[in-house]
């Protein structure tokens, strides 16, 4: 039930042996037939929980997802945590009470949803992590980009523009596994230049919650240090 016009990694986790199978595929409408999830039934209720709809990036995802799901007869209920994990937990509980069939979650913090998602699973609700990994929880699907490759491409572009000099590394939220994979990919490319003394890393910090304000403050401090 996930829409994305990109190449993604689909990780299916079986309930018994917790084996992970990574399948690279193009997702244009739904990811149901080849997974443990059934196809959408007419009238299926989907709870779409977004981390922060104040950001345009997530607004576009919401619109594309909702359009595709409703075209197949599903009903989508969307809520935004606006960057607050406590709010998101309450919203998940609300979706459980509403009796949704599927939860699609962009987690604000993918490490603290285990208890509330256990409640969802007890009610027979399918749980999908979208773009960001949900850890320490029994989820049915995880759909994301090849985040390590994204990080490599970022670093390659920077090295093409500035092959020598001082670099300040700014990461996203330390609670988001994507940010860590971005950094892994970046370092795959940057480390040889660092070892060769072409690049000097003068700072390495992370912006909690992907906060633009936090990132601005960190960078301003870095530039004036």
Regions found by a protein language model. Name each.
Residues 5-16, 21, 39-225:
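A residue-level marker of the well-folded mature domains of exported/periplasmic proteins
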Residues 1-2:
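N-terminal regions encompassing targeting/leader/pre-sequences
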Residues 19-38:
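Gram-negative bacterial Sec-dependent N-terminal signal peptides
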């Amino acid at each position: 039930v996930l829409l994305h016009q990109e190449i993604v990694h689909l990780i299916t986790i079986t309930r018994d042996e917790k084996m992970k199978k990574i399948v690279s595929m193009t997702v244009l409408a739904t990811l149901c037939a080849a997974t443990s999830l059934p196809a959408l039934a007419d009238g299926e209720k989907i709870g779409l929980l977004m981390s922060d709809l104040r950001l345009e990036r997530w607004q576009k995802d919401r619109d594309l997802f909702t359009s595709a799901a409703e075209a197949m007869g599903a009903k989508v209920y969307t809520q935004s945590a606006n960057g607050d994990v406590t709010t998101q937990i309450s919203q998940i509980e609300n979706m459980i009470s509403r009796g949704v069939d599927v939860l699609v979650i962009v987690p604000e913090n993918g490490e603290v949803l285990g208890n509330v998602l256990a409640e969802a699973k007890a009610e027979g609700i399918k749980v999908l992590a979208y773009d960001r990994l949900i850890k320490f929880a029994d989820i049915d699907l995880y759909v994301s980009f090849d985040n390590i490759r994204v990080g490599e491409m970022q670093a390659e572009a920077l090295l093409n523009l500035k092959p020598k000099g001082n670099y300040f590394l700014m990461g996203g939220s330390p609670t988001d596994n994507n940010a860590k994979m971005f950094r892994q990919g970046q370092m795959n490319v940057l480390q040889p230049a660092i070892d060769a003394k072409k690049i000097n890393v003068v700072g390495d910090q992370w912006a909690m919650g992907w906060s633009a304000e936090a990132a601005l403050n960190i960078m301003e401090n870095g530039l004036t240090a």
